[in-house]
UniProtKB/Swiss-Prot annotation:
It is found in: Cytoplasm. It comes from the Eukaryota. The keyword NAD does not apply. E3 ubiquitin-protein ligase involved in regulation of the Notch pathway through influencing the stability and activity of several Notch ligands. Residues 429-490 are annotated as: Disordered. Keywords: Cytoplasm, Metal-binding, Notch signaling pathway, Phosphoprotein, Repeat, Transferase, Ubl conjugation pathway, Zinc, Zinc-finger. The gene is Neurl1b. This is E3 ubiquitin-protein ligase NEURL1B.
Length: 546
């Protein structure tokens, strides 16, 4: 018999998962560096606009705002913190650094495999997990650290601050490489020495915030829409993080806090949220606090328990004090009794309510600069809905038909700051309300008419969120037009330009509130609607008076 050569067959099983083992440390600032080679950027697997220094520790994006995707040259261990310093930040672009992990080996990627953006291009593929750093945290010399644990949860912290949970469901059965997209205002980043993340106790896990930054642009929106399953997992596991029980729910607890200084002292606190609500929003036991923990918001519509009364101001607090507010508030008025609705019928986007037969009017109540702001919405007897922010009048937001019962509703923006608190209501005894009496200000405020401001600054799809009547209606004489009697001319001024005389009737609703020039321009807009009753405009007809 001849000699037999024994060959070792190549192991086709996936490589063993790297797990960073370390002694237990008590609380404190002490950190221990990870043994072994510090991570560097992969020299070949990078976007076409990325330039690396000689040590592959510093990545700089040249030209444009994209094509800045990079990876680490080696897998990252579990609990190993990927630490980045933001070396250069350039204002002017929209969006900031994207970061996360991938289960795909960058060494096997070709230049064609690396797209312009990590979000949404990469995260829509299996095996990629990344999200955006909020722009308000993307400051020069900021140190970002992020890591994955053995449960597939990903946390990040800024400047050694408290951990923020921003992903669940990451596959940790195989190697994970760090994914870093030098995007937007972030021009240059530097990889620092890795350290171990402290093991989070159940108490600290309960305090770990859920990441939520509002998508400011179309590419950012993919951070919240690209991986619905993972976002659901985040919410599903929050109770487990906080309480150590897989079946625990995330409570929405109304804690006593001082009333915002800008809100009136004599608010009536009898009004609560209606029990009918979207499936992705929870209410406190007293139904005065609505919480939406999901970063993407989801279906979070909430309604007032009863219809608003003419002359009544509804006061709410948006977000959490000290945290950036999630986004602009979506506020609306409807003639539909919430008790007749099923939670499954409530959409994520209030615009979808356009298909219903009831009377629905929706507006965006402007950007909220910070969490804890107090907003008031005043329904005047004539149909005007006035907005005030922290006691400052912002003008008219809507004009509605007060001949029927009208409930208020909100879409609660999701995330760590995603909550809406009912502060109470204030009833005015007079039809003409003052800023101090109504908490909403005068219609003559310098911020002008919010209804038209929203329409002019928003896209066509947002400018006229109102349902058409289910059956043809005869032209009504609306109280919303007659109550705030215009001044300056016999026929009144156009409610758009406030210059020309009203000489046009809107078909089919019959309202007269426009000059002919503004009427023609308004009719040419997509989904044009009457400024008073918000019904669709089919035509505008000029009238002649003797």
């Amino acid at each position: 018999m001849g000699n037999t050569v024994h060959r070792t067959l190549p192991d086709s099983s996936p490589p063993a998962r790297l797990l960073a083992t370390r002694p237990c440390y008590g609380p404190g600032p002490e950190r221990r560096a990870v043994l072994g080679e510090a991570p560097r950027f992969h020299a070949q697997a990078k976007g076409k606009n990325v330039r690396l220094d000689g040590h592959s520790r510093r990545a700089t994006r040249r030209n444009s705002f994209c094509n800045g995707v990079t990876f680490t040259q080696r897998p990252i261990r579990l609990y190993e913190q990927v630490r980045l310093r933001l070396v250069a930040v350039r204002p002017g672009w929209s969006g900031a650094l994207r970061f996360g992990f991938t289960a795909h080996d960058p060494s096997l990627m070709s230049a064609q495999d690396i797209p312009k953006y990590a979000c949404p291009d990469l995260v829509t593929r299996p095996g990629y997990w990344a999200k955006a750093l909020p722009e308000n945290l993307a400051l020069r010399d900021t140190v970002l650290a992020y890591w994955a644990d053995r449960h597939g949860r990903v946390f990040y912290s800024v400047n050694d601050g408290e951990p923020v949970l921003f992903h669940c469901g990451v596959a940790v059965g195989g190697p994970l490489w760090a994914l870093i997209d030098v995007y937007g205002i972030t021009d240059e980043v530097q990889l620092l020495e890795s350290t171990f993340a402290d093991t989070l106790t159940p108490l600290r896990l309960g305090q770990a915030r859920l990441s939520a930054c509002p998508p400011p642009g179309s590419h950012d929106a993919a951070n919240f829409d690209n991986n619905e399953l993972e976002n659901n997992q985040v919410v599903a596991k929050l109770g487990h993080l906080a309480l150590g029980r897989p079946d625990a729910a995330v409570p929405c607890v109304a804690r006593e806090r001082p009333r915002p200084a800008s809100s009136p002292a004599l608010l009536d606190a009898e009004l609560r949220f209606h029990a009918t609500r979207g499936p992705d929003v929870s209410l406190s036991a007293d139904r005065r606090l609505a919480c939406a923990p999901r970063p993407d918001g989801g279906r979070t519509l909430v309604f007032s328990e009863r219809p608003l009364r003419p002359g009544e101001s509804l006061c709410v607090e948006v977000g959490r004090p000290g945290l950036a507010a999630p986004a602009a508030v979506a506020f609306g008025i409807t003639s539909c009794d919430p008790g007749a609705l099923r939670p499954s019928e409530l959409p994520a986007d209030p615009a979808a309510l356009l298909d219903r037969k009831e009377y629905w009017v929706v507006a965006r109540a402007g950007p909220v600069p910070s969490g804890g702001d107090a907003l008031s919405f005043t329904l005047r007897p004539g149909g005007d809905v006035l907005l005030a922010v922290n006691g400052r009048p912002r003008g008219r937001l809507l004009c509605v038909d007060t001949s029927q019962a009208l409930w208020a509703f909100f879409a609660v923006r999701g995330g760590v700051a995603g909550q809406l608190r009912l502060l109470g209501t204030l009833q005015s005894s007079s039809e003409t309300m003052t800023p101090s009496g109504s908490f909403s200000g005068s219609q003559d405020d310098s911020d002008s008419d919010m209804t038209f401001g929203v329409n002019q600054s928003s896209s066509a799809s947002e400018s006229s969120l109102v349902t058409a009547p289910s059956s043809p209606l005869s032209p009504p004489v609306s109280p919303a037009f007659s109550a705030p009697e215009p001044t300056g001319s016999r026929n009144g001024e156009c409610t758009v330009c406030f210059d020309s005389e009203v000489d046009t009737v809107i078909y089919t609703c019959g309202h007269m509130c426009l000059c002919h020039g503004c009427g023609l321009r308004l009719r040419r807009q997509a989904r044009a609607c009457c400024p008073i009753c918000r019904r669709p405009i089919k035509d505008v007809i000029k009238i002649y008076r003797p």
